[in-house]
């Protein structure tokens, strides 16, 4: 059998299997949306105004323990980054910055988990649907060649059924794109607040060093 004949026999399967594939992908898409929605909601919201003021006040007074308590009472990725930075107070700004950057990288991975699935479905589901439509049209003309008495009605019926695949592909893609953009916006805003907290801690802890017992104290004036 020639390669063309093999391909033709495959295309004559029609578009129904493509529809089932799109339905399966839509289930995956909805599952990702629900999982990401619950994850981002459960991560909590960091009260930047209130907790930020407490952090600045404690750190300017050299009270790192108080700053840690303020952060421990909060939720969200911002508090995780702040806690990582406060654990390194007294070891220099480089150690503080590296600890917060490492924590931010881990948080980014958690926030963006599975979002690539939504992006991929949003970009490719219409093409999968279009592929199903092409297969359906090929089958419609093949049916016409075997049933010439049916005329245009046979072709139109097959084409209309084939176009369903394109419609289903769009139905899968549009919600996926909307959800992807929504979650990406949430991630960007969260990471922006994380950066704001990190910069605040770096600036507030620049003059803090450790005493012999490991407690953090403000650096004395005059460099003594």
Model-derived segments and their meaning:
Residues 161-178:
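Hydrophobic alpha-helical transmembrane segments of polytopic membrane proteins
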């Amino acid at each position: 059998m020639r390669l063309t004949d093999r391909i033709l026999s495959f295309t004559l399967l029609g578009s129904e299997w493509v529809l089932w594939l799109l339905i399966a992908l839509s289930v995956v898409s909805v599952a990702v949306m629900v999982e990401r929605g619950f994850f981002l909601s459960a991560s909590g919201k960091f009260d930047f105004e209130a907790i930020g003021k407490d952090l600045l006040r404690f750190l300017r007074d050299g009270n790192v323990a108080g700053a840690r308590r303020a952060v421990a009472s909060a939720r969200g990725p911002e508090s995780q980054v702040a806690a990582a930075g406060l654990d390194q107070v007294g070891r220099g700004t480089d150690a503080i910055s590296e600890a917060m950057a490492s924590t931010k990288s881990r948080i980014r991975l958690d926030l963006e988990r599975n979002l690539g699935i939504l992006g991929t479905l949003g970009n490719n589901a219409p093409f999968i649907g279009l592929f199903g439509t092409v297969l359906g049209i090929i089958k419609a003309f093949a049916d016409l060649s075997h049933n010439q008495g049916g005329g245009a009605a046979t072709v139109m019926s097959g084409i209309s059924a084939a176009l369903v695949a394109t419609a289903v592909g769009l139905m899968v893609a549009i919600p996926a794109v909307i959800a992807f953009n929504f979650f990406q916006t949430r991630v960007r805003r969260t990471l922006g607040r994380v950066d704001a907290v990190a910069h605040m801690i770096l600036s507030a802890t620049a003059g803090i060093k450790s005493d012999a017992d490991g407690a953090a104290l403000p650096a004395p004036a005059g460099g003594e």
